[in-house]
């Protein structure tokens, strides 16, 4: 079964699946080839930085940038690329880059995977230092790449993340139909 056959979650948009592409602590940007289901090395980060948390996407979604909805999963351990995590969205980071609007849904593992995050309901519940690390990473990780840039615009709440996932599911269905 390919990732395109994996539903967007157990009860989306509140209970989602995230296909992990990049493990926490990696300085390598991996990307899943949607046609083959194979994970490729997209590039090594040019900066002396690493992904602060696991990073992936919600299957069967299509964001405004033409890719599946991106998700940064706050967790305690790195997860191998290709693994699927059951998650709960808590908010979103709105950004802009050289290609246009680029939003990142922020999520935590579902309570059945790790109850440590059961008290985190929105990004506002995250420690300030965690939000600052995420913002700092995305503001700087492309800096040394020619022609690339990122501007972090603002944090959005849980409802915005849910709407982004819903829209991604609808876009995917429309695109698949025709």
UniProtKB/Swiss-Prot annotation:
Broadest EC class assigned to this enzyme: hydrolase
SUPFAM superfamilies, per the entry: Inorganic pyrophosphatase
The organism's place on the tree of life at top rank: Bacteria
Cystine pairings recorded for this chain: none
Entry-linked InterPro entries: Pyrophosphatase, Pyrophosphatase_sf
Record key words, sorted: Cytoplasm, Hydrolase, Magnesium, Metal-binding
GO biological process: phosphate-containing compound metabolic process
Binding residues annotated for Mg(2+) 2, in chain numbering: 70
Annotated coiled-coil segments of the chain: none
Cofactor: Mg(2+)
Annotated positions binding Mg(2+) 1: 65, 70, 102
Pfam families per UniProt: Pyrophosphatase (PF00719)
Family matches, as NCBIfam families: PRK01250.1
Protein name from the UniProt record: Inorganic pyrophosphatase
Protein source organism: Aquifex aeolicus (strain VF5)
Lineage: Bacteria, Pseudomonadati, Aquificota, Aquificia, Aquificales
Gene assigned in the entry: ppa
């Amino acid at each position: 079964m390919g990732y395109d056959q994996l539903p967007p979650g157990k009860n989306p948009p509140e209970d989602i699946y995230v296909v992990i592409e990049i493990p926490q602590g990696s300085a390598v940007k991996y990307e899943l080839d949607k046609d083959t289901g194979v994970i490729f090395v997209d590039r090594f980060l040019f900066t002396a930085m690493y992904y602060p948390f696991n990073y992936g996407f919600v299957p069967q979604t299509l964001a405004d940038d033409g890719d599946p909805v991106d998700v940064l999963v706050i967790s305690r351990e790195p997860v191998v690329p290709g693994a699927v995590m059951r998650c709960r969205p808590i908010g979103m980071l709105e950004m802009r880059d050289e290609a246009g609007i680029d939003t990142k849904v922020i999520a935590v593992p579902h309570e059945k995977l790790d109850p440590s995050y059961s008290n985190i309901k929105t990004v506002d519940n995250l420690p300030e230092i965690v939000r600052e690390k995420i913002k700092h990473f995305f503001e700087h990780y492309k800096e040394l790449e020619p022609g690339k840039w990122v501007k972090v615009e603002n944090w959005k709440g849980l409802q915005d993340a849910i709407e982004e996932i819903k829209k991604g599911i609808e876009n995917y269905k429309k695109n698949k139909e025709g």
